């Protein structure tokens, strides 16, 4: 299948600073994509290039097999929902949503139908005459989305559009955005620095750092199989320790061999071992894989977050529903499936090839 949109060696800079350097990416139709990364990583620049607000310095942007690198923003089948919503405060809900349709000289009958349909989709039926200044943050968010989808775009861009909402409302809007994307069936491209938001919303995630894509994949793939230390740390909490590969499916940590599910790495290769906090159990000290001392405990609502210090001085973070006494000695236990092996310096292509090789081994 041909991608809906692709970047081919796109380079973009501002004030002699390169933001994107020969970037390649592909977007297929009908999925929810997220550009995830810290501030300054280039994710909003990608959005501006797709929208037509900026043009690439080099490379090309392809939409349905046609170059759009020089195509003006108003000629693209793309609409954007901005972080501040960019609504007109002097216009009511109806006129805000109808604004673009009026510019395009649609008939009043057509505009009425499209506005009413859009309001129904965002669950604001009956709000046509409401003043924008009388609306809550969540309602303004919905109006901004309605104004975008009324133009029937092929791609909807959302630039950190939930960041101004409080936690409860942001969570509610995550459900609504996901449901809306499925109902519309169009491509959503969402920008955020919030990893939990990205995991909850996305079909696919681009994890970015310093203008480069570190890893692309489904939320599950990226969470369970991070390609490097940055991704492992950025996507949720991680315990990362140094180890050495013994052979396929065996890794040595602290001079002790552990079964794992990774293969395709040379024997004796120095590696980094990732174990998620929720995959570690606290048990009696003598029954654990190794011992540690409880250093602190915080109650996080759905679980306790417990920090333990092992004999090497490394701090382990454990998420569990069971309490532990600060200062007590405990045993740490995890299953082979909880261990993920990262090879320092391994590219995403090399990582994917390695994963595929031992998945084929498992299926043989």
From Swiss-Prot:
It is a peripheral membrane protein. GO terms for cellular component: ATP-binding cassette (ABC) transporter complex. Its EC number is 7.6.2.11. Residues 5-235 form the ABC transporter domain. ATP binds at residues 37-44. Keywords: ATP-binding, Cell membrane, Membrane, Nucleotide-binding, Translocase, Transport. It catalyses: ATP + H2O + polyamine-[polyamine-binding protein]Side 1 = ADP + phosphate + polyamineSide 2 + [polyamine-binding protein]Side 1. SUPFAM superfamilies: MOP-like (SSF50331), P-loop containing nucleoside triphosphate hydrolases (SSF52540). Its main location: membrane. GO terms for molecular function: ABC-type putrescine transporter activity; ATP binding; ATP hydrolysis activity. It comes from the Bacteria. InterPro entries: AAA+_ATPase, ABC_SmlMolc_Importer, ABC_transporter-like_ATP-bd, ABC_transporter-like_CS, Mo/tungstate-bd_C_term_dom, P-loop_NTPase, PotA_ATP-bd, Transp-assoc_OB_typ2. It is an enzyme of class 7 (translocase). It is found in: Cell membrane. Part of the ABC transporter complex PotABCD involved in spermidine/putrescine import. Responsible for energy coupling to the transport system. Belongs to the ABC transporter superfamily. Spermidine/putrescine importer (TC 3.A.1.11.1) family. The complex is composed of two ATP-binding proteins (PotA), two transmembrane proteins (PotB and PotC) and a solute-binding protein (PotD). This is Spermidine/putrescine import ATP-binding protein PotA. The gene is potA.
């Amino acid at each position: 299948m041909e991608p809906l949109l692709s970047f081919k060696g796109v380079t973009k800079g501002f004030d002699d600073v390169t933001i994107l350097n020969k970037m390649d990416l592909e977007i297929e139709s009908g999925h929810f994509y997220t550009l995830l990364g810290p501030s300054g990583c280039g994710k909003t620049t990608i959005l501006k290039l797709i929208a037509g607000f900026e043009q690439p310095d080099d490379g090309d942007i392809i939409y349905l097999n046609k170059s759009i690198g020089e195509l003006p923003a108003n000629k693209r089948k793309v609409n954007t929902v901005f972080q501040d919503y960019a609504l007109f405060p002097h216009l009511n809900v109806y006129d805000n949503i109808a604004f673009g349709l009026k510019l395009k000289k649609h008939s009043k009958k057509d505009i009425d139908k499209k506005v009413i349909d859009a309001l129904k989709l965002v669950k604001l039926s009956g709000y046509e005459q409401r003043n924008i200044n009388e609306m809550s943050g969540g309602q303004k968010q919905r109006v901004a989305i309605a104004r975008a989808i009324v133009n029937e775009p092929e791609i909807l861009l959302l630039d950190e559009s939930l960041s101004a909402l409080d936690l409860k409302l942001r969570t509610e809007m995550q459900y609504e955005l996901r449901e809306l994307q499925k109902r519309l069936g169009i491509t959503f491209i969402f920008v955020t620095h919030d990893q939990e938001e990205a995991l909850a919303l996305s079909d696919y995630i681009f994890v970015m750092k310093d203008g480069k894509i570190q890893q692309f994949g489904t939320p599950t793939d990226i969470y369970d199989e991070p390609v490097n230390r940055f991704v492992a740390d950025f996507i949720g909490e991680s315990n990362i320790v140094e180890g050495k590969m013994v052979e396929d499916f065996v890794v040595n940590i602290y001079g002790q061999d552990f079964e794992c599910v990774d293969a395709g790495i040379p024997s004796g290769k120095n590696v980094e071992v990732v174990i998620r906090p929720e995959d570690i159990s606290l048990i009696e000290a003598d029954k654990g894989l190794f011992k540690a001392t409880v250093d602190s405990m915080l109650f996080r609502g759905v679980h306790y977050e417990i920090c333990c210090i092992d004999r090497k001085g490394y701090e382990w973070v454990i998420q569990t529903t069971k309490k532990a006494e600060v200062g007590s000695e405990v045993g740490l236990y995890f299953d082979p499936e909880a261990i993920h092996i990262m090879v320092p310096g391994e590219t995403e292509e090399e990582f994917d090839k390695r994963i595929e090789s031992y998945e084929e081994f498992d299926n043989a």
